[in-house]
Amino acid sequence: TVYVDNGTGPMTVLDANNPPSGLTTDLVQRLQGLDVDDVDSNGITNEARKAMGAPIHGQPTMGSYGSGTEDYVVFIGSNDGLLHSINVNNGSENWAWLPRELINNVPVLRNNPGMGSVTRPLYGLDGNWTVAKVGSDNLLIGGMRQGGSNIYAVKLPTTRTGIPELKWKITPATTGFSRLGYTWSQPVLTRVRVGGQEKDVVVFGGGLDYSTYEIGGSSVVASTGNLGNAVYMVDAATGNLVWSAASGGLCRRRRARGPW
């Protein structure tokens, strides 16, 4: 089952018979794992494709559905834009989620364009995720690394067949996060005292400012970019900003190479 979010709240199953804007029936079927392009040239287009996008920089994260038993799963993002929930016992997929912001990547990836010598590859959910117990919720919190500038918190269902929810989302357009760059930093869950009470918070770095890099290996000795040079602390339950610090100083580099 592949889900797409509708803002915060329970996610919606991607329906090949009623695809959302930006997708077609065959694109949804491809996301669902069908060999709609007959990659193996056997004339069958409704069989399993048995392939997923490359998890280039992200690493698997172990978690549990919190159903009272040892119901462990592995979560990993991939560069076709999907976050996968995988059964640790047999490797089967429980469900996958496509962030709405990455819908427009799907037809581009299907066309599989050639990559020129100075072209940066198209990335999806490329970062590492953190499992966090916040109140009664099990949350999966992560960014996009090379895929973009968002931070997501997914509320996990209590069973493998339950529906995941998008608990909260942070983007550079969110108030207080204008310095947020590409979200390379893996979020860290901790507790601090706020207003005399302990609070679960998530801390992450401001990320990378891609505007300061030249693709193709050109040297960049200094940057006046305004993105990424910040540290953020947010309420783990809501995503609301608790504290931040930023610097307007130069960031000196020896060399910036690309593509990665």
Predicted regions and their residues:
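A fold-level detector for beta-propeller and closely related beta-sheet-rich head/sensor domains
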Residues: T1-W260
